[in-house]
Amino acid sequence: MDLHLIGFLLWFFVVQVTTSSAHRNITTTIPALIVFGDSIMDTGNNNDIPTLLKSNFPPYGRDFPGAIPTGRFSDGKVPSDIIAESLGIAKTLPPYLGSNLKPHDLLKGVIFASGGSGYDPLTSTLLSVVSMSDQLKYFQEYLAKIKQHFGEEKVKFILEKSVFLVVSSSNDLAETYWVRSVEYDRNSYAEYLVELASEFIKELSELGAKNIGLFSGVPVGCLPAQRTLFGGFERKCYEKLNNMALHFNSKLSSSLDTLKKELPSRLIFIDVYDTLLDIIKNPTNYGFKVADKGCCGTGKIELMELCNKFTPFTCSDASTHVFFDSYHPSEKAYQIITHKLLAKYRKYLNT
């Protein structure tokens, strides 16, 4: 097993044991969770920027504490919240661009992810959202604020002890590829994304982040909207898109292996593809009734403004669906995915 992976996993799961202790007054080993990426992790950064890609209105958030639509692209919590809570850091994490963010809120981490973003800079331009490069600029601003309010030692502590997660590529693969298809075929575009993702990791490491988890692409061809657009009358998964995601994952994993030898950071490749695909292919095994349609509206195409409080046919119980809208999983699915990943890594460590 790679020494970087052993180090990351030992560090990660010692924290899991520590934070699951009954003695909640013990100082948490991980001070903060800091996340970059897209709508899978976004907790509301798009709310106050000029983009159509928003979810701060019902029925989004209907299963969130207080039934508040916060700008999370789901019925409830998203993985960044679930991971933060699992690590004993916080029950939810704020968006960095949130208007109510106070200096003390910065200490447990923030979310820089912006729904609609991607590794390809064209992706964020097309959707008018926060690009990955701008997310890094905001991160530098965040570090400056930590230094201003809490001192240089606190900055070093957060950089060395926090978890940094990067979750992107879905919008690139599902949307921007069609614009780029004049320049690239599917495989070469996936490889272009790997170059961009690798450069992002290098820059994040150069800024001092020591513990970085990089998520794989997901089976985007099985998203309800992609089934509707490309799956034919039976709305099957669009395998050409899934194969592009698999090629991206393979090349990204290899690139990360190379980066582990070059960078001082601990790096781990988190493969979520098979986990989500198994839930989609075998929904009843996980307590779901519907996997090919979202809960909102008909479940076939509704997303963002098309998924609103007036949208007819919205299901009464989102926990019966793998997806909440035509692109994003329900909170129940996110909970299952997150805990399956934790169990997977724990088992891997014990081999």
Swiss-Prot record:
Residues 1-22 form the signal peptide. Pfam families: Lipase_GDSL (PF00657). The active site is at residues 39, 325, 328. GO terms for molecular function: lipase activity. Keywords: Glycoprotein, Hydrolase, Lipid degradation, Lipid metabolism, Secreted, Signal. The keyword Isomerase does not apply. Gene3D superfamilies: SGNH hydrolase. Its EC number is 3.1.1.-. Glycans are attached at residue 25. It comes from the Eukaryota. CDD domains: SGNH_plant_lipase_like. GO terms for cellular component: extracellular region. GO terms for biological process: lipid catabolic process. It is found in: Secreted. PANTHER family: (RAPE) HYPOTHETICAL PROTEIN, GDSL ESTERASE/LIPASE EXL3. Belongs to the 'GDSL' lipolytic enzyme family. This is GDSL esterase/lipase At3g14820.
